[in-house]
Protein backbone atom coordinates (compact mmCIF):
# COMPACT_ATOMS: atom_id res chain seq x y z
CA UNK A 1 0.00 0.00 0.00
CA UNK A 2 2.89 2.34 0.73
CA UNK A 3 4.29 1.81 -2.76
CA UNK A 4 0.93 2.74 -4.32
CA UNK A 5 0.80 5.87 -2.15
CA UNK A 6 4.32 6.89 -3.10
CA UNK A 7 3.64 6.34 -6.79
CA UNK A 8 0.39 8.35 -6.64
CA UNK A 9 2.14 11.15 -4.76
CA UNK A 10 5.00 11.22 -7.27
CA UNK A 11 2.49 11.31 -10.13
CA UNK A 12 0.65 14.20 -8.45
CA UNK A 13 3.87 16.19 -8.03
CA UNK A 14 4.93 15.46 -11.62
CA UNK A 15 1.55 16.44 -13.11
CA UNK A 16 1.52 19.58 -10.94
CA UNK A 17 4.93 20.59 -12.24
CA UNK A 18 3.93 19.90 -15.84
CA UNK A 19 0.75 21.97 -15.46
CA UNK A 20 2.51 24.85 -13.69
CA UNK A 21 5.06 25.09 -16.50
CA UNK A 22 2.88 24.06 -19.43
CA UNK A 23 -0.33 26.04 -18.99
CA UNK A 24 1.28 29.52 -19.04
CA UNK A 25 3.35 28.51 -22.06
CA UNK A 26 0.22 27.29 -23.84
CA UNK A 27 -1.71 30.45 -22.97
CA UNK A 28 1.14 32.69 -24.12
CA UNK A 29 1.55 31.04 -27.49
CA UNK A 30 -0.54 32.27 -30.41
CA UNK A 31 -3.44 29.90 -31.05
CA UNK A 32 -2.05 27.59 -28.40
CA UNK A 33 -5.22 27.47 -26.35
CA UNK A 34 -7.49 26.45 -29.20
CA UNK A 35 -5.13 23.67 -30.27
CA UNK A 36 -4.34 22.20 -26.83
CA UNK A 37 -7.48 22.91 -24.83
CA UNK A 38 -8.31 19.20 -24.52
CA UNK A 39 -4.83 18.39 -23.21
CA UNK A 40 -5.10 21.08 -20.53
CA UNK A 41 -8.52 19.85 -19.42
CA UNK A 42 -7.28 16.26 -19.40
CA UNK A 43 -4.29 17.25 -17.27
CA UNK A 44 -6.51 19.17 -14.86
CA UNK A 45 -8.90 16.22 -14.60
CA UNK A 46 -6.00 13.86 -13.94
CA UNK A 47 -4.69 16.25 -11.27
CA UNK A 48 -8.06 16.34 -9.48
CA UNK A 49 -8.30 12.54 -9.66
CA UNK A 50 -4.80 12.16 -8.20
CA UNK A 51 -5.62 14.55 -5.34
CA UNK A 52 -8.49 12.28 -4.32
CA UNK A 53 -6.42 9.11 -4.79
CA UNK A 54 -3.60 10.47 -2.63
CA UNK A 55 -6.12 11.51 0.04
CA UNK A 56 -7.78 8.10 0.07
CA UNK A 57 -4.47 6.21 0.13
CA UNK A 58 -3.21 8.49 2.90
CA UNK A 59 -6.17 7.51 5.07
CA UNK A 60 -5.10 3.84 4.80
CA UNK A 61 -1.47 4.58 5.68
CA UNK A 62 -1.78 7.12 8.49
UniProtKB/Swiss-Prot annotation:
The keyword Coiled coil does not apply. The keyword Translocase does not apply. Gene3D superfamilies: Photosystem II PsbZ, reaction centre (1.10.287.740). Pfam families: Ycf9. GO terms for biological process: photosynthesis; photosystem II stabilization. It is a multi-pass membrane protein. It is found in: Plastid, Chloroplast thylakoid membrane. Belongs to the PsbZ family. May control the interaction of photosystem II (PSII) cores with the light-harvesting antenna, regulates electron flow through the 2 photosystem reaction centers. PSII is a light-driven water plastoquinone oxidoreductase, using light energy to abstract electrons from H(2)O, generating a proton gradient subsequently used for ATP formation. NCBIfam families: PS_II_psbZ. This is Photosystem II reaction center protein Z. It comes from Chara vulgaris. The gene is psbZ.
Amino acid sequence: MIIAFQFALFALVAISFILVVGVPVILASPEGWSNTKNAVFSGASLWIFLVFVVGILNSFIA
